[in-house]
Protein backbone atom coordinates (compact mmCIF):
# COMPACT_ATOMS: atom_id res chain seq x y z
CA UNK A 1 0.00 0.00 0.00
CA UNK A 2 1.14 3.59 -0.57
CA UNK A 3 2.73 5.30 2.40
CA UNK A 4 1.25 8.13 4.41
CA UNK A 5 3.95 10.81 4.32
CA UNK A 6 4.78 14.15 5.84
CA UNK A 7 6.84 16.16 3.34
CA UNK A 8 9.25 18.83 4.60
CA UNK A 9 10.95 21.14 2.10
CA UNK A 10 11.27 24.73 0.99
CA UNK A 11 13.07 25.69 -2.27
CA UNK A 12 12.53 24.77 -5.91
CA UNK A 13 14.99 21.86 -5.49
CA UNK A 14 12.41 20.06 -3.33
CA UNK A 15 9.39 20.51 -5.61
CA UNK A 16 10.06 17.63 -8.07
CA UNK A 17 10.30 15.17 -5.17
CA UNK A 18 7.01 16.31 -3.63
CA UNK A 19 5.20 16.10 -6.97
CA UNK A 20 6.73 12.72 -7.82
CA UNK A 21 5.73 11.17 -4.49
CA UNK A 22 2.15 12.39 -4.94
CA UNK A 23 2.09 11.17 -8.56
CA UNK A 24 3.12 7.70 -7.41
CA UNK A 25 0.11 7.48 -5.12
CA UNK A 26 1.60 8.26 -1.73
CA UNK A 27 -0.72 10.05 0.69
CA UNK A 28 0.78 13.47 1.46
CA UNK A 29 -0.67 14.01 4.94
CA UNK A 30 0.94 17.43 5.40
CA UNK A 31 3.60 19.66 3.88
CA UNK A 32 5.95 21.56 6.19
CA UNK A 33 7.81 24.52 4.72
CA UNK A 34 9.30 27.84 5.80
CA UNK A 35 7.22 30.96 6.35
CA UNK A 36 6.40 33.35 3.50
CA UNK A 37 8.98 36.10 3.07
CA UNK A 38 8.77 39.56 1.49
CA UNK A 39 10.28 39.59 -1.99
CA UNK A 40 10.19 41.49 -5.27
CA UNK A 41 9.88 45.20 -5.90
CA UNK A 42 6.74 45.51 -3.81
CA UNK A 43 8.24 43.37 -1.03
CA UNK A 44 5.01 41.39 -0.86
CA UNK A 45 4.94 38.18 1.14
CA UNK A 46 5.69 35.24 -1.13
CA UNK A 47 5.13 31.61 -0.26
CA UNK A 48 7.90 29.10 -0.84
CA UNK A 49 8.02 27.02 -4.05
CA UNK A 50 7.11 23.95 -1.99
CA UNK A 51 4.05 25.70 -0.50
CA UNK A 52 2.84 26.65 -3.97
CA UNK A 53 3.29 23.07 -5.18
CA UNK A 54 1.44 21.76 -2.11
CA UNK A 55 -1.51 24.01 -2.87
CA UNK A 56 -1.73 22.46 -6.34
CA UNK A 57 -1.91 19.06 -4.65
CA UNK A 58 -4.47 20.37 -2.14
CA UNK A 59 -2.20 19.18 0.66
CA UNK A 60 -2.27 20.94 4.06
CA UNK A 61 0.61 23.42 4.44
CA UNK A 62 2.23 24.18 7.80
CA UNK A 63 4.86 26.85 8.47
CA UNK A 64 5.87 26.50 12.14
CA UNK A 65 8.56 28.83 13.47
CA UNK A 66 9.97 25.98 15.54
CA UNK A 67 9.60 22.23 15.93
CA UNK A 68 10.96 22.20 19.47
CA UNK A 69 7.76 22.76 21.43
CA UNK A 70 5.31 20.22 22.82
CA UNK A 71 2.61 21.73 20.62
CA UNK A 72 4.73 21.33 17.46
CA UNK A 73 5.48 17.71 18.33
CA UNK A 74 1.83 16.96 19.05
CA UNK A 75 0.80 18.52 15.73
CA UNK A 76 3.42 16.48 13.90
CA UNK A 77 2.36 13.23 15.55
CA UNK A 78 -1.28 13.96 14.76
CA UNK A 79 -0.58 13.39 11.05
CA UNK A 80 0.03 9.70 11.88
CA UNK A 81 2.59 9.47 9.07
CA UNK A 82 4.40 6.26 8.21
CA UNK A 83 7.49 8.31 7.30
CA UNK A 84 8.70 11.84 6.68
CA UNK A 85 10.55 12.96 3.55
CA UNK A 86 12.86 15.95 4.01
CA UNK A 87 14.37 17.90 1.10
CA UNK A 88 16.15 21.20 1.81
CA UNK A 89 13.69 22.12 4.55
CA UNK A 90 16.02 24.62 6.20
CA UNK A 91 15.27 23.72 9.81
CA UNK A 92 16.99 21.13 12.01
CA UNK A 93 14.65 18.38 13.18
CA UNK A 94 14.83 17.58 16.91
CA UNK A 95 15.14 13.95 17.97
CA UNK A 96 11.49 13.78 19.04
CA UNK A 97 10.39 14.64 15.50
CA UNK A 98 12.86 12.17 13.99
CA UNK A 99 11.41 9.45 16.22
CA UNK A 100 7.76 10.24 15.52
CA UNK A 101 7.09 8.44 12.20
CA UNK A 102 7.00 4.66 12.56
CA UNK A 103 9.36 4.09 9.62
CA UNK A 104 11.62 7.12 10.18
CA UNK A 105 12.58 10.34 8.41
CA UNK A 106 14.40 10.27 5.07
CA UNK A 107 16.45 13.11 3.62
CA UNK A 108 17.45 13.78 0.02
CA UNK A 109 20.92 15.37 0.11
CA UNK A 110 22.69 16.92 -2.88
CA UNK A 111 26.15 15.40 -2.57
CA UNK A 112 28.01 12.10 -2.41
CA UNK A 113 28.19 11.77 1.34
CA UNK A 114 30.26 11.98 3.45
CA UNK A 115 31.71 14.62 1.11
CA UNK A 116 29.97 17.97 1.45
CA UNK A 117 27.77 17.58 4.47
CA UNK A 118 25.99 20.82 5.26
CA UNK A 119 24.19 23.77 3.72
CA UNK A 120 25.71 24.36 0.27
CA UNK A 121 26.86 21.04 -1.22
CA UNK A 122 26.11 21.89 -4.85
CA UNK A 123 28.07 25.14 -4.78
CA UNK A 124 31.01 23.68 -2.89
CA UNK A 125 31.38 20.66 -5.16
CA UNK A 126 31.69 22.91 -8.21
CA UNK A 127 33.95 25.47 -6.51
CA UNK A 128 36.32 22.75 -5.29
CA UNK A 129 36.78 21.40 -8.81
CA UNK A 130 35.07 18.07 -8.11
CA UNK A 131 34.68 15.84 -11.16
CA UNK A 132 31.37 14.42 -9.96
CA UNK A 133 28.59 14.87 -7.46
CA UNK A 134 25.22 13.30 -6.86
CA UNK A 135 22.19 12.83 -4.65
CA UNK A 136 21.67 10.44 -1.78
CA UNK A 137 18.69 9.28 0.24
CA UNK A 138 19.61 8.75 3.89
CA UNK A 139 17.70 7.85 7.03
CA UNK A 140 18.08 10.87 9.26
CA UNK A 141 19.71 10.87 12.67
CA UNK A 142 20.60 13.68 15.06
CA UNK A 143 23.87 14.54 13.29
CA UNK A 144 24.50 16.91 10.38
CA UNK A 145 23.94 14.72 7.30
CA UNK A 146 25.42 11.70 9.11
CA UNK A 147 22.57 9.22 8.63
CA UNK A 148 22.79 5.79 7.03
CA UNK A 149 22.57 5.89 3.22
CA UNK A 150 19.83 4.04 1.34
CA UNK A 151 20.39 4.97 -2.32
CA UNK A 152 22.59 7.21 -4.47
CA UNK A 153 22.91 8.56 -8.02
CA UNK A 154 25.99 10.22 -9.52
CA UNK A 155 26.51 12.82 -12.24
CA UNK A 156 29.64 14.28 -13.83
CA UNK A 157 30.43 17.96 -13.30
CA UNK A 158 31.80 19.50 -16.48
CA UNK A 159 33.46 22.89 -16.78
CA UNK A 160 30.41 24.14 -18.70
CA UNK A 161 28.02 23.50 -15.80
CA UNK A 162 26.87 26.19 -13.39
CA UNK A 163 25.23 25.48 -10.06
CA UNK A 164 21.88 26.03 -11.79
CA UNK A 165 22.64 23.21 -14.23
CA UNK A 166 23.72 20.86 -11.44
CA UNK A 167 20.72 21.88 -9.32
CA UNK A 168 18.19 21.11 -12.05
CA UNK A 169 19.75 17.78 -12.95
CA UNK A 170 20.00 16.62 -9.33
CA UNK A 171 16.47 17.79 -8.52
CA UNK A 172 15.12 15.53 -11.26
CA UNK A 173 17.37 12.60 -10.32
CA UNK A 174 16.60 13.06 -6.65
CA UNK A 175 12.85 12.91 -7.19
CA UNK A 176 13.19 9.56 -8.95
CA UNK A 177 15.59 8.32 -6.27
CA UNK A 178 13.21 9.18 -3.42
CA UNK A 179 10.30 7.51 -5.22
CA UNK A 180 12.41 4.35 -5.50
CA UNK A 181 13.45 4.60 -1.85
CA UNK A 182 9.86 4.97 -0.64
CA UNK A 183 8.79 2.03 -2.81
CA UNK A 184 11.51 -0.09 -1.18
CA UNK A 185 10.49 1.16 2.27
CA UNK A 186 6.88 0.27 1.51
CA UNK A 187 7.94 -3.29 0.60
CA UNK A 188 10.13 -3.56 3.70
CA UNK A 189 13.27 -3.92 1.60
CA UNK A 190 15.13 -0.62 2.04
CA UNK A 191 18.80 -1.44 2.65
CA UNK A 192 20.86 1.03 4.71
CA UNK A 193 24.65 1.47 4.71
CA UNK A 194 26.65 3.45 7.27
CA UNK A 195 28.61 6.39 5.91
CA UNK A 196 32.37 6.13 5.74
CA UNK A 197 34.37 8.07 8.31
CA UNK A 198 36.92 8.88 5.59
CA UNK A 199 36.60 11.82 3.22
CA UNK A 200 34.27 13.91 5.37
CA UNK A 201 34.03 17.54 4.22
CA UNK A 202 31.61 20.32 5.15
CA UNK A 203 29.75 22.59 2.74
CA UNK A 204 29.57 25.89 4.60
CA UNK A 205 26.79 28.28 3.69
CA UNK A 206 27.79 30.64 0.88
CA UNK A 207 28.86 34.05 2.16
CA UNK A 208 28.46 37.01 -0.19
CA UNK A 209 31.89 38.20 0.96
CA UNK A 210 33.54 35.31 -0.92
CA UNK A 211 31.92 36.18 -4.26
CA UNK A 212 34.65 38.55 -5.53
CA UNK A 213 36.69 36.95 -8.31
CA UNK A 214 40.41 36.51 -7.64
CA UNK A 215 42.09 36.45 -11.04
CA UNK A 216 45.42 35.55 -9.43
CA UNK A 217 44.11 32.00 -9.13
CA UNK A 218 44.49 29.46 -11.98
CA UNK A 219 41.93 29.70 -14.77
CA UNK A 220 40.23 26.43 -13.79
CA UNK A 221 39.71 27.71 -10.22
CA UNK A 222 38.35 31.05 -11.46
CA UNK A 223 35.92 29.25 -13.78
CA UNK A 224 34.71 26.90 -11.04
CA UNK A 225 34.34 29.84 -8.63
CA UNK A 226 32.19 31.68 -11.17
CA UNK A 227 30.06 28.68 -12.07
CA UNK A 228 29.65 27.61 -8.45
CA UNK A 229 28.10 30.98 -7.59
CA UNK A 230 25.94 31.46 -10.71
CA UNK A 231 23.42 32.97 -10.62
CA UNK A 232 23.31 33.65 -6.87
CA UNK A 233 24.98 35.39 -5.22
CA UNK A 234 26.99 35.81 -8.42
CA UNK A 235 30.77 36.00 -8.66
CA UNK A 236 31.76 39.56 -9.45
CA UNK A 237 34.56 41.83 -10.56
CA UNK A 238 34.86 45.52 -11.40
CA UNK A 239 35.29 46.75 -14.97
CA UNK A 240 36.42 50.32 -15.69
CA UNK A 241 33.55 51.87 -17.68
CA UNK A 242 33.73 55.56 -18.62
CA UNK A 243 36.47 56.00 -16.06
CA UNK A 244 34.51 54.48 -13.19
CA UNK A 245 34.71 50.98 -11.68
CA UNK A 246 31.42 49.18 -12.34
CA UNK A 247 30.56 45.92 -10.60
CA UNK A 248 29.75 43.11 -13.02
CA UNK A 249 28.51 39.64 -12.15
CA UNK A 250 30.10 36.98 -14.34
CA UNK A 251 27.57 34.18 -14.86
CA UNK A 252 29.28 31.92 -17.40
CA UNK A 253 32.76 31.60 -18.86
CA UNK A 254 35.09 29.12 -20.53
CA UNK A 255 38.79 28.33 -20.36
CA UNK A 256 40.61 30.27 -23.10
CA UNK A 257 44.06 30.47 -24.64
CA UNK A 258 46.30 33.39 -23.82
CA UNK A 259 48.40 34.85 -21.06
CA UNK A 260 48.83 38.16 -19.33
CA UNK A 261 48.91 39.78 -15.94
CA UNK A 262 46.12 38.48 -13.68
CA UNK A 263 42.99 40.54 -14.34
CA UNK A 264 44.23 41.89 -17.69
CA UNK A 265 41.83 41.87 -20.66
CA UNK A 266 43.94 40.23 -23.38
CA UNK A 267 41.69 40.52 -26.46
CA UNK A 268 38.53 42.19 -27.76
CA UNK A 269 36.24 39.35 -26.62
CA UNK A 270 36.46 39.84 -22.85
CA UNK A 271 39.12 37.20 -22.33
CA UNK A 272 40.75 37.84 -18.96
CA UNK A 273 44.16 36.54 -17.88
CA UNK A 274 44.39 34.54 -14.67
CA UNK A 275 47.30 33.39 -12.52
CA UNK A 276 47.69 30.48 -14.92
CA UNK A 277 45.81 30.62 -18.22
CA UNK A 278 42.75 32.72 -19.00
CA UNK A 279 38.96 32.67 -19.06
CA UNK A 280 36.61 34.10 -21.67
CA UNK A 281 33.40 35.59 -20.28
CA UNK A 282 30.29 34.42 -22.14
CA UNK A 283 27.46 35.74 -19.93
CA UNK A 284 27.34 38.58 -17.42
CA UNK A 285 25.02 40.94 -15.60
CA UNK A 286 25.20 44.57 -14.55
CA UNK A 287 23.41 45.72 -11.41
CA UNK A 288 19.71 46.24 -12.09
CA UNK A 289 19.95 44.74 -15.58
CA UNK A 290 19.00 41.42 -17.10
CA UNK A 291 21.75 38.86 -17.84
CA UNK A 292 23.28 39.28 -21.29
CA UNK A 293 25.87 37.63 -23.45
CA UNK A 294 29.36 39.09 -23.51
CA UNK A 295 28.82 39.88 -27.19
CA UNK A 296 25.72 41.94 -26.39
CA UNK A 297 27.55 43.72 -23.58
CA UNK A 298 30.57 44.57 -25.73
CA UNK A 299 28.40 46.03 -28.50
CA UNK A 300 27.19 48.69 -26.09
CA UNK A 301 30.26 48.91 -23.85
CA UNK A 302 33.53 48.13 -25.64
CA UNK A 303 36.32 47.01 -23.31
CA UNK A 304 39.76 47.61 -24.78
CA UNK A 305 42.58 45.11 -24.73
CA UNK A 306 44.96 45.86 -21.86
CA UNK A 307 42.29 47.09 -19.45
CA UNK A 308 42.70 45.74 -15.92
CA UNK A 309 39.74 44.15 -14.18
CA UNK A 310 39.48 44.70 -10.44
UniProtKB/Swiss-Prot annotation:
Residues that bind (6S)-5,6,7,8-tetrahydrofolate: 111-114
The EC number(s) this enzyme carries: 2.1.2.9
Main EC class the enzyme belongs to: transferase
Pfam family, one: Formyl_trans_N
Residues spanning the signal sequence: none
Job description of the protein: Attaches a formyl group to the free amino group of methionyl-tRNA(fMet). The formyl group appears to play a dual role in the initiator identity of N-formylmethionyl-tRNA by promoting its recognition by IF2 and preventing the misappropriation of this tRNA by the elongation apparatus.
Record-linked HAMAP family: Formyl_trans (MF_00182)
Stated name of the protein: Methionyl-tRNA formyltransferase
Organism: Rhodopseudomonas palustris (strain TIE-1)
